[in-house]
Amino acid sequence: MASQGTKRSYEQMETDGERQNATEIRASVGKMVGGIGRFYIQMCTELKLSDYEGRLIQNSLTIERMVLSAFDERRNKYLEEHPSAGKDPKKTGGPIYKRVDGKWMRELILYDKEEIRRIWRQANNGDDATAGLTHIMIWHSNLNDTTYQRTRALVRTGMDPRMCSLMQGSTLPRRSGAAGAAVKGVGTMVMELIRMIKRGINDRNFWRGENGRKTRIAYERMCNILKGKFQTAAQRAMMDQVRESRNPGNAEIEDLIFLARSALILRGSVAHKSCLPACVYGPAVASGYDFEREGYSLVGIDPFKLLQNSHVYSLIRPNENPAHKSQLVWMACNSAAFEDLRLSSFIRGTKVVPRGRLSTRGIQIASNENMDTMESSTLELRSRYWAIRTRSGGNTNQQRASAGQISIQPTFSVQRNLPFDKTTIMAAFTGNAEGRTSDMRAEIIRMMENARPEEVSFQGRGVFELSDERAANPIVPSFDMSNEGSYFFGDNAEEYDN
């Protein structure tokens, strides 16, 4: 967990809050999603979208991207200083899909960033509402996590494709703040640090001068974020060592890769939040629902209730399976890309299948795809039960480092037993004595060797009926746990490459 003095709930991070009580947090998170909803309604009016077109997830993504681009200070500044052909630094836009004469048409729109900022601020009582922007970023990140497997990125930084369950949030922009840092997996943080160290190795001036000082501060901050995700003293001590290094180089890279491997068993704590597309919040606000007054939480029943009665549509390519498209978005909405498939299936009430068995590509439609053959269908985003999102890695007891599930980073706080084949993971540690030998390494390896998969993780925690808003009667599911239900393993999902 984060070091004692700095513990703030995820909702507080989400809303830049000082210490708030539960009611205030619910109100400020409600205010945040309400603002996104109001902004979306206004954009749909501007673009003259019909109700159906406004509920099309592809239109939602374009509008969300426009507002993120309008507020991306650093990129805007960069674009103004380095003008590139055919790109107006003051404008933003994207494809909007409309139904014309029984066919879907693509229309490219262009807006002044200033205008988008004005509409966003107006929807948020004049504030910049950065929390709302971060919320949208996390929704995009969760969608990417569900759609793409980051094998190539892992291999590029010297990590192993088997570490894909550590990669939550790997596509989040750097400006995503505390709320963004909370949802990043151990592997994501390790990768960011390795990239930084590699730049330092290749560029002599990276750590020098006024800029170098800022770089150093950023490096130490990232180290501290990663340290805060680890739950054992030895892993944290190793992070201190990486952070305090005078001149970070290959030894630190090896240490970080070692730590990432160790996190497959000694799981880090990573937050999970249900962030929904703007086209879900919009219609709810339009129907008169007052999020701020009612209060809202990203980790409780609220997103489930919202998805239960929302209608979201998606464009479907000729050979895609609409049910599979629905699964992709359901997983993204519930931040469940790295959860055990059996558990997701139980909560959803329909079978959730691995990525490689889905007949669907991502949600976005490329500009060169033919629109003539596009159909649209309803996304089925409802669930049978609801469950509380967790931020623990599912290790059962921190004192005697127990084993977390290996190819899983749990999303829901629900009891499951831990099938896992430790030998495959321990094999990753033999024969690589790279980097320093240290007491900490020995200690971590010892903990991993001794880590017993306890019988169950999240003991006694269950799912709840959707009518059980107070979470009074947990239903503890039972699974056939003979094999582990990983979404990505043994699989050939598309790669994410910007």
UniProtKB/Swiss-Prot annotation:
Effect of residue 101 to N: In strain: A/Fort Monmouth/1/1947-MA
Location within or outside the cell: Virion; Host nucleus
Motif (Unconventional nuclear localization signal): 1-18
Segments of skewed composition (Basic and acidic residues): 8-21
Effect of residue 391 to E: In strain: A/Fort Monmouth/1/1947-MA
GO molecular function: RNA binding; structural molecule activity
InterPro entries, sorted: Flu_NP
Post-translational modification: Late in virus-infected cells, may be cleaved from a 56-kDa protein to a 53-kDa protein by a cellular caspase. This cleavage might be a marker for the onset of apoptosis in infected cells or have a specific function in virus host interaction.
Motif Bipartite nuclear localization signal: where in chain: 198-216
GO cellular component, as recorded: helical viral capsid; host cell; host cell nucleus; ribonucleoprotein complex; viral nucleocapsid
Main location class: virion
Region described as Disordered: spans on this chain: 1-21
Keyword tags: Capsid protein, Helical capsid protein, Host nucleus, Host-virus interaction, Ribonucleoprotein, RNA-binding, Viral nucleoprotein, Viral penetration into host nucleus, Virion, Virus entry into host cell
GO biological process, one term: viral penetration into host nucleus
Family: Belongs to the influenza viruses nucleoprotein family.
Function according to Swiss-Prot or TrEMBL: Encapsidates the negative strand viral RNA, protecting it from nucleases. The encapsidated genomic RNA is termed the ribonucleoprotein (RNP) and serves as template for transcription and replication. The RNP needs to be localized in the host nucleus to start an infectious cycle, but is too large to diffuse through the nuclear pore complex. NP comprises at least 2 nuclear localization signals that are responsible for the active RNP import into the nucleus through cellular importin alpha/beta pathway.
Subunit-structure text: Homomultimerizes to form the nucleocapsid. May bind host exportin-1/XPO1. Binds to viral genomic RNA. Protein-RNA contacts are mediated by a combination of electrostatic interactions between positively charged residues and the phosphate backbone and planar interactions between aromatic side chains and bases.
HAMAP family found in the cross-reference section: INFV_NCAP
Entry protein name: Nucleoprotein
Organism, scientific name: Influenza A virus (strain A/Fort Monmouth/1/1947 H1N1)
